[in-house]
């Protein structure tokens, strides 16, 4: 997909019915705001247009603005795998080769179900004064991570813009261009994600892998937990206006020596998470990283776990003795 159209090119074309070549979009229309401006959302590789089909159903139309190697094959294999594993965190999507005509020719597009949900940042912002809800969110996020690990799947670009939360608190992932599924083993790792979420070794990683999310999972989980204890960090770090959550690219490059790590180290419930990030940053390859559910186990918990495995639920078998107080009392009374 060389010489791809610009965002402006796509915006012009999607507003001209005869330039929309995909039959599934026939007689539909792109969404506009009150001023008549076309609504769109731009990422590093795609521009997304909210679109209403002829039956009134709202979908997302994703158009590439940067090349992704073997995009069609990737999309097909990802769709096949997601149907197979049937996890609740993904939406239906279809690759359409004949999508939209532009000055650069007819471009392929991806059609996805539109999800009525809040972005991760919006959800956190709305619940900053509700620590229990944020901790429940962190637990749900960890559960999702475990489910992905069991399926041998990684999203590849976990960050605030690609994680949505429905009203019931359930999580949805969007933007699948960077995903790993087993049938894509050996494909190039081209979409690396945002700097505030990625391990330094990710930038030199060659092929997509099931381990691509391990570090970003730890960053996101820690950020949510930290904000549940220190909601003031939201304003102090101006999180709403950044492309990060709790950690900046400089924080990650520091290896764990910046102020945010010292803040986490000061809280007994967060120090273990801070230590886990620092430990991860000592590795030179993402292949050496641990999944979230293992990374957040403290060293002491890990040791106790090994003891329990070896000795059972009770690490030390203790012989208990309860004296027969009734007989003792009777003997004492007779003696007196």
Model-derived features with residue positions:
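Conserved activation segment of eukaryotic-like protein kinases, specifically the C-terminal portion
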Residues: 187-202
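Catalytic-loop of the protein kinase fold
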Residues: 145, 149-166
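Helical subdomain adjoining the active site within ATP-dependent kinase catalytic cores
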Residues: 226-335
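Activation of the activation-loop gatekeeper triad in protein kinase-fold domains
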Residues: 175-180
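ATP-binding glycine-rich loop module of kinase domains
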Residues: 36-38, 44-92
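Conserved structural core of kinase catalytic domains
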Residues: 89-136, 186
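Juxta-kinase regulatory segment immediately upstream of eukaryotic protein kinase catalytic domains
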Residues: 1-39, 73-75
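Conserved end of the kinase activation segment
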Residues: 201-211
């Amino acid at each position: 997909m060389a010489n791809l159209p610009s965002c402006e090119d796509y915006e012009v074309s999607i507003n001209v019915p005869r330039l929309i070549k995909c039959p599934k979009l026939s007689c539909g229309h792109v969404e506009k705001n009150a001023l008549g401006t076309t609504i769109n959302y731009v990422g590093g590789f795609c521009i997304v247009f909210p679109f209403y089909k002829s039956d009134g159903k709202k979908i997302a139309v994703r158009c590439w603005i940067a090349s992704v190697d073997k995009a069609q094959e990737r999309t097909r294999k990802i769709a096949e795998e997601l149907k197979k594993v049937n996890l609740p965190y993904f939406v239906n999507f279809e690759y359409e080769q004949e999508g939209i005509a532009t000055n650069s020719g007819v471009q392929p597009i991806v059609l996805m179900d539109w999800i009525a949900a809040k972005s991760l940042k919006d959800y956190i912002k709305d619940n900053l004064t509700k620590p229990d809800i944020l901790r429940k969110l962190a637990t749900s996020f960890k559960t999702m991570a475990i489910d992905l690990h069991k399926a041998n799947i990684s999203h590849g670009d976990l960050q605030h813009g690609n994680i949505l939360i429905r009203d019931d608190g359930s999580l949805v992932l969007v933007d699948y261009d960077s995903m790993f599924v087993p049938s894509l083993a050996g494909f190039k790792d081209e979409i690396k994600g945002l700097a505030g979420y990625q391990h330094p070794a990710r930038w030199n990683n060659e092929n997509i892998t099931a381990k691509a999310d391990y570090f970003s999972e730890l960053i996101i989980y820690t950020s949510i937990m930290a904000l549940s204890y220190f909601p003031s960090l939201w304003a102090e770090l101006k999180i709403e206006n950044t492309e990060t959550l709790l950690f900046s690219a400089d924080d990650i490059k520091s290896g764990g020596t910046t102020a945010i790590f010292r803040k986490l180290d000061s809280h007994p419930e967060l120090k273990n998470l801070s230590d886990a990030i620092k430990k991860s940053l000592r590795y030179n390859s993402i292949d050496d990283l641990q999944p979230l559910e293992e990374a957040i186990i403290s060293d002491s918990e890990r040791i106790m776990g090994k003891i329990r495995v070896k000795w059972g639920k009770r690490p030390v078998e203790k012989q208990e003795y309860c004296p027969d107080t009734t007989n003792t009392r009777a003997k004492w009374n007779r003696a007196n």
